């Protein structure tokens, strides 16, 4: 007997034949939503491969789309941000082959840059950029992915963004630069040196009017003094 449970099992197993037969028998279940407003495509995209080849997941997606699932439908939202199929692939399923298949069909690459950042997934970053995501994406957040990477200490991802054109001097909603955020967190010096290498300015005032140069100049670590002096000379 076809049920929501049996369809859920088929989707997670990438059993596209059972899924197709089940939806043929019970087309009324196509519109079912799981927790967090996930439709069957979102469930599929959030399912990890666990050693399986992605081809079956792609075929399962095709069955769902052929049966009428909307490629552009989202699950839950937070403000202007949307949990899209590609976001589920990037954030939970980590299935970039399926993500690219959906992107080729016209799925939006937006809303997924921070998910790639959280997972420190540069391959996902490159995939999203390939299909039109903005490196300094502000479509659903008030800060750029680069500042998100800095805030989450994803410094490798942050540098990957800089290498792909991100603005190293972007400011947060509160007017803070990456330098300000890192000084507040007490990040290791090597990350300051990395930002300086990419042209970060130290003369931009923060919310309290203090620049990164001023704050660095008061540090006990002489490496910060030297960097502050260098930034001051460049500014």
Which residues does each predicted region cover?
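Intrinsically disordered, low-complexity regulatory segments in ankyrin-centric signaling systems
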Residues: 1-67, 91, 100, 104, ...
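Ankyrin-repeat boundary/"N-cap" motif
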Residues: 2-7, 32-49, 74-88, 108-116, ...
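Ankyrin repeat A-helix N-terminal signature
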Residues: 9-14, 43-56, 84-95, 115-122, ...
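Conserved ankyrin/ankyrin-like repeat signature
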Residues: 18, 56, 60, 97-98, ...
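Ankyrin repeat domain, specifically the short helix-to-loop turn at the C-terminus of the second helix
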Residues: 23-28, 61-70, 100-108, 126-134, ...
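Ankyrin-repeat and related helical/solenoid repeat scaffolds used for protein-protein interactions
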Residues: 155-156, 163-210
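Leucine-rich solenoid repeat scaffolds
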Residues: 196, 201-235
């Amino acid at each position: 007997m076809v049920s929501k449970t049996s369809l859920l099992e088929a989707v997670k197993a990438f059993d596209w034949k059972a899924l197709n037969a089940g939806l043929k028998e019970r087309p009324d279940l196509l519109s079912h939503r799981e927790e967090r407003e996930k439709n069957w495509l979102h469930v599929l995209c959030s399912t990890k491969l666990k050693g399986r080849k992605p081809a079956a997941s792609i075929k399962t997606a095709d069955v769902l789309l052929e049966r009428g699932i909307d490629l552009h439908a989202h699950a839950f939202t937070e403000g202007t941000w949307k949990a899209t199929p590609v976001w589920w692939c990037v954030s939970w399923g980590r299935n970039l082959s399926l993500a690219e298949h959906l992107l080729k069909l016209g799925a939006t690459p937006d809303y997924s840059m921070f998910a790639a950042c959280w997972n420190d997934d540069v391959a996902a970053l490159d995939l999203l950029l390939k299909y039109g995501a903005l490196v300094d994406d502000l479509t659903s957040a008030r800060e750029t992915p680069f500042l998100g990477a800095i805030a989450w200490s994803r410094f490798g991802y942050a540098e990957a963004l800089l290498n792909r054109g991100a603005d190293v001097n972007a400011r947060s909603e509160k007017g803070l630069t990456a330098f300000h955020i890192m000084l507040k967190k007490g990040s290791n010096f090597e990350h300051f040196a990395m930002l300086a290498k990419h042209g970060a300015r130290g003369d931009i005032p923060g919310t309290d009017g203090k620049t990164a140069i001023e704050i660095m100049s008061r540090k006990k670590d002489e490496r910060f003094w030297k960097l502050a002096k260098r930034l001051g000379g460049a500014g």
